[in-house]
Amino acid sequence: MATMKSLIGLINKIQRACTVLGDHGGEGMSLWEALPTVAVVGGQSSGKSSVLESVVGRDFLPRGSGIVTRRPLVLQLHKTEDGTTEYAEFLHAPKKRFADFAAVRKEIEDETDRITGKSKQISNIPIQLSIYSPNVVNLTLIDLPGLTKVAVDGQPESIVQDIENMVRSYVEKPNCIILAISPANQDIATSDAIKLAREVDPTGERTFGVATKLDIMDKGTDCLDVLEGRSYRLQHPWVGIVNRSQADINKRVDMIAARRKEQEYFETSPEYGHLASRMGSEYLAKLLSQHLETVIRQKIPSIVALINKSIDEINAELDRIGRPIAVDSGAQLYTILELCRAFDRVFKEHLDGGRPGGDRIYGVFDHQLPAALKKLPFDRHLSTKNVQKVVSEADGYQPHLIAPEQGYRRLIDGSISYFKGPAEATVDAVHFVLKELVRKSISETEELKRFPTLASDIAAAANEALERFRDESRKTVLRLVDMESSYLTVEFFRKLHLEPEKEKPNPRNAPAPNADPYSDNHFRKIGSNVSAYINMVCDTLRNSLPKAVVYCQVREAKRSLLNFFYAQVGRKEKEKLGAMLDEDPQLMERRGTLAKRLELYKQARDDIDAVAWK
């Protein structure tokens, strides 16, 4: 069956591991907060430090005026065999044993200053102190800064609320046992500790009341109403404590002797003699130790459940952010190629419609290209005035006889050249969409988020490939336009009705305007014929340009976006492969933290399993 020593020792061990990992409570549920603890709460000058020293049987806590305890002190007491030497160990100095308890006090002060500086600031980072002695019981106590009502010189005005918030963060946890220290020579209703305990534990199920300074109460008064639970009832009995006087402290009266003196006080007291067996620091320590053991037994199932849940959550997060990468070049190359394929899958999903974005390419063909073609200045180029000018220039000094073929060709060539602008604009628009899809695909590839260097390399390689595809596509679409100029569709003109238009008779029987081969009507007819031919070419290019762009850019992007990159990676040495897999420092730090926390939880589970519970 699990003994008190093994149970409390188990919790102590897990607490120390939590502190090493920086788990000392805070927002949300943590293993630290799931562990049963005893928090010592009291106002300044309530005798809180003296109670702790009485329980330990040693002078070891810093003393002075104002706020002395400025960091939580996790005090783990380990009972040893009679006759063994007492010593103390700090978690931050694990290889150093302190046999001189004056040195323990000095180390507490120094370790406090290491975090808070020489100021009177406070910190919620705990100090872990273990004391091994035959004069203690197995017990863990957390000494918290004393509650205060005013700030002293050198402290911010917020110190009063800061201390209360820190103390409250401990005592409001359902697994915290509250040891509320109240001086008996003051009205219990004004006790800072009792007031706070009442707020966080209104039923008193988690609160142990301790009345100090019973020996210096005014004559004719006593603390029986409190100790017997009449003035303020708790679920657990009140315990009276008689601490050493200042004179005893100055004389360095031995703590063991002070314990005997305390017990004699209760046994010989007319007021408290009938309560003597349930008074004093020794009884308080045993009472707390027994209760802590009971609470630990009750809480172990929920602690195990929390540990198992935390292990599952940590493993899930490690899987999400990725496990550490192997250091050999083969594994690194395999990892890089797998990450490239993951990016490639996301990119293709965008193009194929599995993700949004690919539809923008169709928008270029269906809206942007037709709109650009409609805006071409054919009306100006094929105006009667310009047609006449071009035809006349083509004829030169010898006018055409029947049809101005050279004029036609010049007008057609000039018109077709306008298509180069929309063709190149279509190539550039699709290139822009593809680049944007590369950017989106990089950001949406979860596996790449831990490798910013590789993500940048892939993006650069993909964009370089897209530029090559764009250049080839631009050459192709310009060839398509040039092909329309290089060989005209003669059949189109043969089918045209080339007879001059019949005009209504001139009322004055004047000759018809089109009788003159150089009349406006004649040039309008030429412009109309060229316009009809250009419309046919426009329809052809409206269909062929998208085909060329898709073939040269979209199709190649799907087929071979990273082919050149694959070849480059395959030739890299181990060091360069490793550099490509450099991770985000914050991610590496997070993985390290998770790995340590996972180790903590697994070790805690093993430690709990190792305890015999039957």
Swiss-Prot record:
One of its GO terms (cellular component) is plasma membrane. Residues 32-301 form the Dynamin-type G domain. Residues 68-70 are annotated as: G2 motif. GTP binds at residues 45-50, 213-218, 243-246. Ubiquitous. Belongs to the TRAFAC class dynamin-like GTPase superfamily. Dynamin/Fzo/YdjA family. This is Phragmoplastin DRP1C. The lineage of its organism: Eukaryota, Viridiplantae, Streptophyta, Embryophyta, Tracheophyta. The gene is DRP1C.
